[in-house]
Amino acid sequence: MHLLGPWLLLLVLEYLAFSDSSKWAFEHPETLYAWEGACVWIPCTYRALDRDLESFILFHNPEYNKNTSKFDGTRLYESTKDGKVPSEQKRVQFLGDKNKNCTLSIHPVHVNDSGQLGLRMESKTAKWMERIHLNVSERPFPPHIQLPPEIQESQEVTLTCLLNFSCYGYPIQLQWLLEGVPMRQAAVTSTSLTIKSVFTRSELKFSPQWSHHGKIVTCQLQDADGKFLSNDTVQLNVKHTPKLEIKVTPSDAIVREGESVTMTCEVSSSNPEYTTISWLKDGTSLKKQNTLMLNLHEVTKDQSGKYCCQVSNDVGPGRSAEVFLQVQYAPEPSTVQILHSPAVEGSQVEFLCMSLANPLPTNYTWYHNGKEMQGRTEEKVHIPKILPWHAGTYSCVAENILGTGQRGPGAELDVQYPPKKVTTVIQNPTPIREGDTVTLSCNYNSSNPSVTRYEWKPHGAWEEPSLGVLKIQNVGWGNTTIACAACNSWCSWASPVALNVQYAPRDVRVRKIKPLSEIHSGNSVSLQCDFSSSHPKEVQFFWEKNGRLLGKESRLNFDSISPEDAGSYSCWVNNSIGQTASKAWTLEVLYAPRRLRVSMSPGDQVMEGKSATLTCESDANPPVSHYTWFDWNNQSLPYHSQKLRLEPVKVQHSGAYWCQGTNSVGKGHSPLSTLTVYYSPETIGRRVAVGFGSCLAILILAICGLKLQRRWKRTQSQQGLQENSSGQSFFVRNKKVRRAPLSEGPHSLGCYNPMMEDGISYTTLRFPETNIPRTGDAETSEMQSPPPDCDDTVTYSVLHKRQMGDYENVIPDFSEDEGIHYSELIQFGVGERPQAQENVDYVILKH
């Protein structure tokens, strides 16, 4: 029964713990590391079903008290509803909240802080104690260097330096060193302050070489000021192929035949250790040579060559630099090689002495039929012209610094002479000109054996009309050489004969010397007449432009080129054989527009209503690309083509026009050209009709007026005679006054106006009444008592016609005021007249 008690209590506690743990969930690093004087940053998060957190207590090494059912220990931090109670040192800061963040910071941290930190969390419904391990050392603990499993030379690797520490309030840095010297490669440093891990890491990438093998790499922990705190070191294990060097005895690797040579393959470094050794000569492996030392006893000349050693390990083979071994020996027995054998008399023969030796022979001795040939000490003996006495046995002896070789078997020279004194004869008279037919014959003095055939060179499609005769039709130009050979068993070639064909100059062409670019008007221009060859070489030059001879020099110069110099040029080169002309070469001169003028179609006088085309003609190269038109007021017209078309043309278009042309070189403008637009017959007819009608109407009115006036006068005259009254009538005609013609202005153009005014003016004079009788009027005395309603009047009239031309643009020769003045004075009978005011009435009749 007593045994069941503790187990039952344990089960109850486990159940309670399990029930509480289901309500709480924490995440934080399991263990945190620091050192005396540093700080600790504890990232922490939690999740509780009851988020109403009432208190938070941070214990150091907490222990559960069964009696009080509470935890005992040093309280580093406490937070309750009543407020915060800071620790004595005020080192602990709670950086979280009452929701999910339980992050803490201890700064500074001490060694006695090591142990367990207990986070006591209490809510209304649950409690929980979360434990965190803290490890604080007296001194800064070293970082840890992590290397890849294997490092090979020239392969990039990453070195990692890891420190299980990071705190926001305590900055640190990690420094890489190689053999105590800071490494040049840039390292990448990163930190982690998460609920999973807290660390500072530095990664360094570099490509190790075999020389780095065994070197010490250090990762040094420093504070913010660069002060050393701790470090970690590792030794690099760089896998590499064997590194080799050959040592030769003698050191210059030059020995004489029969001497010994020792070559030692020194392995300066190999990781891992080498396993196989081999030697190579000229790239081929030497058999049974698998040690680091190669001994060559009594070397021969065949052992000369390039030697190297090859040593392999698990990484691969390593090969040393090549050593060239030279084995020196005296010349071996000589042999003679005869070139061009058998030899023909007159030909050339070359003898070559061949003997193997190292170093090469420096002196040779030649023998002819056992007799030393004086002055022949070279490797080759050349006889330019073999004669019959040159036949026989030839041998030689070679010599170098090691000794003199032996004379080998001789070589026999068999001289069989071909036909002697073979000559090629040109049958034609000289000189030979291009296109001639040339006949050559092959002659000789003697031959043994007899001549059986002839050969010619060079070969061509030539004709051999007979044995030993060659005929060349239409011989070509150039320094052609012909040689013939008279052949028996061998051929004997005659000395080549140059046909020396003369020809006219060839490949004549015109070449521009300057300028190198486009030719503009005013440039200095030089043309060169070139040709490839001429025979004879004495030549003359002629320049021609458009069929006209210009000069007789090889170069044609223009100090200041003008557009008139443009054209087709060709040059002629002649010698005593003939002349050759070049292809026509066009000289193009670029210049601004010039000689501009305005041409008018159909002419400079155009009837209104028709069409008129103004064309801006110019001389330019390149052609005009832009035209501008201007009127007589120098106003630019909105036309930019070469032709200005006016359709239909009007009288208002009359005036002066000019144009301006522009190209890539410059611009130019034309002089003024006047366009006159005159009236059409229809317009003139209409205006003449209107003018004639107006004049006719005025004339009719004037005639009618005169007739009416005369009738009125007769009527008044008759009434006066009947009334025995005295009256006087008279006409007054104005004196014609010559006036200066109207000035003709520049714009005296217009239409006839038929409505010009003619005027007839009337005037009436009234006299006061009088009873004084007139003397001399006895015949009319019975009429002296006029009726009381009659009054004395004088009627004065003027008929005035204004002189004017029929048309407004036709001015009369003179202008004058001409009028017919008619006046009639009537004196009525004497009698009592009523008092009346004297007055003058004017009447003006206009028509």
Swiss-Prot record:
**Carries keyword NADP?**
no
Q: Which residues are annotated as modified residue Phosphotyrosine in the UniProt record?
A: Y762, Y807, Y822, Y842
Instruction: Please give the chief subcellular localization of this protein.
Output: membrane
Domain Ig-like V-type residues, every copy:
20-138
What residues form the membrane-spanning segments?
688-708
InterPro entries in the record: CD80_C2-set (IPR013162), Ig-like_dom (IPR007110), Ig-like_dom_sf (IPR036179), Ig-like_fold (IPR013783), Ig_CD22 (IPR056386), Ig_sub (IPR003599), Ig_sub2 (IPR003598)
UniProt signal peptide: 1-19
Q: What does the record give as the function of this protein?
A: Most highly expressed siglec (sialic acid-binding immunoglobulin-like lectin) on B-cells that plays a role in various aspects of B-cell biology including differentiation, antigen presentation, and trafficking to bone marrow. Binds to alpha 2,6-linked sialic acid residues of surface molecules such as CD22 itself, CD45 and IgM in a cis configuration. Can also bind to ligands on other cells as an adhesion molecule in a trans configuration.
- Quaternary organization: Predominantly monomer of isoform CD22-beta. Also found as heterodimer of isoform CD22-beta and a shorter isoform. Interacts with PTPN6/SHP-1, LYN, SYK, PIK3R1/PIK3R2 and PLCG1 upon phosphorylation. Interacts with GRB2, INPP5D and SHC1 upon phosphorylation. May form a complex with INPP5D/SHIP, GRB2 and SHC1.
What is the name attached to this protein's record? Answer: B-cell receptor CD22
